[in-house]
Each structure stands twice: as structure tokens, then as C-alpha cells.
């Protein structure tokens, strides 16, 4: 509905250009918002006030001219001017009912699909050789929810798990294995059963022994040079580490597969060429032995140019080098229209610099959109980054296990007579959903406080509340036998029916915001509001005890659409629904 009003206003703008009211090359930014007070209509725009200067007319006069020029629409019952020049649109109830009727038998719930694009999404991307920790949660689940929404809206999505599968950490592991082999022979391989412990021991040696650190760096060079033994062990380290990652993904219900892994090592062959191409364009400068690029737009507080380091003095490459190679691959090979990077906000400057350099060096097409969708940190209840009591990093698998244990206690307390198998399954879904939803419901760019108590509450904007809301709606249909709604029609008479219908009709515009801005929290807020709108409708409008069959069937269709929208919305967040709680 919102996009329909925007389309009417766009046509009006074009008409103004043809009449000479607006310059032919004028580009208007049309904003249409939902009203909070329904006495002011359903939708409103401040377009008249935005155009008043360029059109040379006062806002109310221009607002009336816009109304007079608007194309006729069956969706609009009336249009009014309010205040200094706001234009309020009142939606036709019968047209809204028709829109909802069309959604009933549509797999996309009546959503008009946008022009499909090829979208590369870079998310999760943990460093290998050690276990995933809570710091990997946000990129993994925010990226996955946006991916799901993009696919639902018809876009071609290419997942890219840009894992850190190269570099110094592998030199440490190789050097440590070398030492163990000297002591224990082939038995040294048994140590790899716990790669995390193996990594910590290697890191300790690296920090304590300069000789060990030198050997580790030498082995990185041998690995990069294609040494057969080093590469065999490297593949083994990666395989063990990736197996752990995918166990976590499976538990989280994340859609990443082994086929989506395209790590740093995938770009090794192109790194030297990246340096040569930058040099050939005269972009490289030598600074303290390193090869760097300075861009005028990036300076520190003292006004000094900030470098993008492409190659270190010792010949090693950095993140910027592999990121540039990846961007070129995503532009030229994957043919991406958009590339989305779900990476910590603290990397904002890095991405601004490499995005700018990629365009400057023509490594990517000018029309390809590069977007860093950064996120804040997950903090403990003390407001500091989430840690164990001893100050260590919290493993993601341990966090999920604790969520499961707490959810089991909660579900058992509410269902003391339920069998253990059913309890365990409900607790699994509730625990994982609570962790994911608590994160996804927060603005992506904000830090947030992690609290099991809040996320497992059945009150407020939480996963347990929404899972229960879904079972409540779906439960209506368990009380009906021989139901046939094939000839039923949606009729919006009661005010609460209209409120619910209006909320259902917003699903498409909400999903477009999710994919345009990478903000799943707007979907969470919408689902919470939808559950509230249904609750108000259900209290005011008897469904199974309606006055007549026509009214009952209409309300059953509204209930069915609500259940489908809640389920689809939760699924797009990567959350399973339950048939009973």
C-alpha cells in the first residue's frame, strides 16, 4: 500500500515536470509514512513542504495541487491536507480487503516482488584454527536473516563465508606440530582431536619463544609457496575447524554450507596481480619499506593521509589486499549488483578505504554497490564485552548449551506433566530462538546487553512471546473440523479487523526495509506489533463464535493470514515455529 501511494506521487511529480511546475531534471525524494493517529488517515507525506521552494508556491497551495493531480486509485478513499501542508491518505477498506484476499492463495503473501538482483553476502567469516566464540554470533545470524529475506523477495543470493584460513595462526600450528612430532612421532596427530587446546598451546609457544615465532613465520612462507607437507597439514587443520563451524551453524539453524566457504586462501593467486595492477596505475607509494596507497579523502585528526597497506616490507599481504582481490572476483566473476559485508562496526574505516580504492582502481564496476553493514557489540550485564567469569572468551557452543538448559527449566516449569522428549524439543527451539531473537530485535548498529532472564521471558518483544503467539493463532484451526475456506471472502467491518488488516498489508514494505538497510530488527518489531494486533482483534471479534458463517469465515481467513505471516516472518529470522508450547 505504501509503495502504491509512492507510485501515485511519482506520477504526480512527472506531471508537474511536464507542466513546468518543477524543473525537468528535478529528482524528488518522496517519503510516505504510516500515521500514528488514524484520524489523520493511514498514510501521510510531507512532499508539498519539501517542494515548496523549488516550485515557488506555499505548502498548502502545493498540497492541493498535488491532490488535484494525483491519478485516480481504487485504494484511496479520500485525501486531506493537514497542518502546514501534510497530505493524509485514507485507504479504502474494500480495496484493503481485496489485497488481503489476493494474499490468501499467494506463496509470497501478496507481496509485489522487486526487480531481481544478484546479491553477494559476506557474513560469519570466522578465523579458522580455533572455535567460534560469541563475537561471531552477530555477523552470522544478522547476515543469515537478511539472506533469507533477499531470497524470499526473489533475488539471486550468493553466500560467501570469507573464513580466515590463511596467515600467521597456521604458521603457529605447523611449528607446534613440528615440535610435537619431534617428541612423539606420529602420535602427535592425536593432539588435533581438540584443536582449540592445540591452538592455545601453539599461541603460548609463539608468545614465549622468539625462535618458535621465527619458525612459525618461515612455515607461513613455505605454506604460501606450496610446500606439500605444509599444505596437507593446513587442509587438515581447516577441515577440523570447518567441521566445528558447521556443527554450530546447524545448531543455530543457519543456512551456510561448505559450498559457501570462500576464504582468504581462495584469493592467494591474485594477490601479486593486485599489487602489480595498483602499481601500473601509479597508485602505489613506498612507506617504510611497505607498499601503500594514500587517498586524499582519508586523513587523521592531524590532517595526515591514512595509508591502505597493500604489501608489508617483508613481502606479506594484508586484509586489504585479499579484500581487494575478493571485490574484483565478486564484480567480474560473480557479477554482483550488491555486495553486503556484515562485519563489526569497528572495521568501518577499513571498508571505507578499500571500497574507495576498489572503485578508484576500477577493480569493480561503477554500478556495483559495496555496503558495509556494521554491527555493535554484545555486552554482559556489566556493560562490557561478554566474557566468562575468569575474563576469557565465551565459546558460542557453550552459550547455546546454557540457553538450552535454561529453556528446558522454563518449559518444564510451565508443563510439569509433559513427556521428556517433547520437553527437550520445545526447549531446543525456545533456547536457540531466544538467543537469536534477542540479538536480531536490537538495532544492528547498537551495542546491547545480553540477558538470559530477559530473552527467555514470555512478556514483551521476545522469542518465547512470539512463539506462543503463533501457537495461539494456529491453535484456532485445531478446534475446527471439515473447514473449507475456498469460497470465503475477507470483509473488514470492525475497527479491530481493519487494524489487523492494515498491519498484515505492511509485511512487504517491512521486508524491503530489511533487505535495503540490512536491519532485521524492523521485522522483529513488526512481528511483535502484528501479534499485538491479532490479540486485540481476537478479544474484540469472536472467530468461531461469530454472528454468521460469512463473518466467521472472514475472520478465519484473517487468522490464517496472521499465522502464515508470523510463521514466515520468524522463519526469515531463522527461527522455527512450534505447534505447542
Curated annotation (Swiss-Prot):
Pfam families, per the entry: Arg_tRNA_synt_N (PF03485), DALR_1 (PF05746), tRNA-synt_1d (PF00750)
Gene name as annotated: argS
Primary residence: cytoplasm
Protein name: Arginine--tRNA ligase
Motif ('HIGH' region): 126-136
Subcellular location: Cytoplasm
Alphabetical UniProt keywords: Aminoacyl-tRNA synthetase, ATP-binding, Cytoplasm, Ligase, Nucleotide-binding, Protein biosynthesis
Biological processes annotated in GO: arginyl-tRNA aminoacylation
Species per Swiss-Prot/TrEMBL record: Shewanella putrefaciens (strain CN-32 / ATCC BAA-453)
Subunit structure comment from the entry: Monomer.
Family membership: Belongs to the class-I aminoacyl-tRNA synthetase family.
Reactions mediated catalytically: tRNA(Arg) + L-arginine + ATP = L-arginyl-tRNA(Arg) + AMP + diphosphate
InterPro entries, per the entry: aa-tRNA-synth_I_CS, Arg-tRNA-ligase, Arg-tRNA-synth_N, Arg-tRNA-synth_N_sf, ArgRS_core, DALR_anticod-bd, Rossmann-like_a/b/a_fold, tRNAsynth_Ia_anticodon-bd
One CC-aspect GO term: cytoplasm
Coiled-coil features, chain-numbered ranges: none
Source superkingdom: Bacteria
Entry EC no(s): 6.1.1.19
Alphabetized GO MF terms: arginine-tRNA ligase activity; ATP binding
Amino acid at each position: 500500500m505504501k509503495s502504491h501511494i509512492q507510485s501515485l506521487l511519482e506520477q504526480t511529480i512527472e506531471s508537474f515536470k511536464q507542466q513546468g511546475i518543477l524543473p525537468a531534471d528535478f529528482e524528488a525524494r518522496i517519503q510516505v509514512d504510516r500515521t500514528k493517529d488514524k484520524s489523520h488517515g493511514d498514510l501521510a507525506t510531507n512532499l508539498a513542504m519539501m517542494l515548496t521552494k523549488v516550485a515557488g508556491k506555499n505548502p498548502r497551495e502545493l498540497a492541493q495541487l498535488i491532490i488535484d493531480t494525483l491519478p485516480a486509485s481504487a485504494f484511496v478513499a479520500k485525501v486531506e491536507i493537514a497542518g502546514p501542508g501534510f497530505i493524509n491518505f485514507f485507504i479504502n477498506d474494500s480495496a484493503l480487503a481485496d489485497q488481503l484476499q489476493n494474499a490468501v492463495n499467494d506463496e509470497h503473501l501478496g507481496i509485489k516482488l522487486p526487480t531481481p538482483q544478484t546479491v553477494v553476502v559476506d557474513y560469519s567469516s570466522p578465523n579458522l584454527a580455533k572455535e567460534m566464540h560469541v563475537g561471531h554470533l552477530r555477523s552470522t545470524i544478522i547476515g543469515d536473516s537478511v539472506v533469507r529475506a533477499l531470497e524470499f523477495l526473489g533475488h539471486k543470493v550468493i553466500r560467501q563465508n570469507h573464513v580466515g584460513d590463511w596467515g600467521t595462526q597456521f604458521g603457529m600450528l605447523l611449528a607446534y606440530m613440528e615440535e610435537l612430532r619431534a617428541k612423539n612421532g606420529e602420535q602427535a596427530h592425536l593432539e588435533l582431536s581438540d584443536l582449540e587446546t592445540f591452538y592455545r598451546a601453539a599461541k603460548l609457544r609463539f608468545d614465549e619463544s622468539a625462535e618458535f615465532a621465527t619458525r612459525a613465520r618461515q612455515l607461513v612462507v613455505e605454506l604460501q609457496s606450496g610446500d606439500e607437507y605444509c599444505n596437507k597439514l593446513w587442509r587438515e587443520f581447516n577441515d577440523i575447524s570447518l567441521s566445528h563451524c558447521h556443527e554450530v551453524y546447524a545448531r543455530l539453524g543457519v543456512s551456510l554450507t561448505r559450498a559457501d566457504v570462500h576464504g582468504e586462501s581462495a584469493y592467494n593467486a591474485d594477490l601479486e596481480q593486485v599489487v602489480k595492477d595498483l602499481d601500473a596505475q601509479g597508485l602505489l607509494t613506498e612507506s617504510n619499506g611497505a607498499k601503500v596507497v594514500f587517498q586524499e579523502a582519508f586523513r587523521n585528526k592531524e590532517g595526515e593521509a591514512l595509508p591502505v597497506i597493500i604489501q608489508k616490507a617483508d613481502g606479506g599481504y594484508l586484509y586489504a589486499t585479499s579484500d581487494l582481490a575478493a571485490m574484483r572476483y565478486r564484480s567480474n566473476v560473480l557479477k554482483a549488483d550488491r555486495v553486503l559485508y556484515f562485519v563489526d562496526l569497528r572495521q568501518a574505516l577499513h571498508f571505507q578505504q578499500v571500497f574507495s580504492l576498489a572503485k578508484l582502481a576500477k577493480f569493480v564496476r561503477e554500478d556495483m554497490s559495496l555496503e558495509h553493514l556494521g554491527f555493535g557489540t554484545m555486552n554482559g550485564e556489566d556493560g562490557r564485552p561478554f566474557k566468562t567469569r575468569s575474563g576469557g572468551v565465551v565459546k558460542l557452543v557453550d552459550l547455546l548449551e546454557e540457553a538450552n538448559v535454561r529453556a528446558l527449566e522454563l518449559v518444564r516449569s510451565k508443563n510439569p506433566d509433559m513427556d521428556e522428549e517433547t520437553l527437550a524439543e520445545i526447549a531446543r527451539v525456545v533456547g536457540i530462538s531466544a538467543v537469536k531473537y534477542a540479538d536480531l530485535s536490537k538495532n544492528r548498529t547498537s551495542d546491547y546487553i545480553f540477558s538470559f532472564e530477559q530473552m527467555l521471558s514470555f512478556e514483551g518483544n521476545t522469542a518465547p512471546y512470539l512463539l506462543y503467539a503463533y501457537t495461539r493463532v494456529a491453535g484456532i484451526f485445531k478446534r475446527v473440523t471439515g473447514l473449507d475456506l475456498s469460497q470465503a471472502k475477507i470483509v473488514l467491518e470492525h475497527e479491530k479487523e481493519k487494524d489487523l488488516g492494515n498491519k498484515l498489508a505492511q509485511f512487504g514494505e517491512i521486508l524491503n526495509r530489511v533487505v535495503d538497510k540490512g536491519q532485521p530488527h524492523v521485522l522483529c518489531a513488526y512481528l511483535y506489533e502484528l501479534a499485538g494486533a491479532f490479540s486485540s482483534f481476537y478479544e474484540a471479534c469472536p472467530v468461531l463464535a461469530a454472528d454468521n458463517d460469512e463473518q466467521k469465515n472472514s475472520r478465519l481467513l484473517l487468522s490464517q493470514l496472521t499465522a502464515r505471516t508470523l510463521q514466515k516472518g520468524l522463519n526469515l529470522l531463522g527461527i522455527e515455529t512450534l505447534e505447542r508450547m
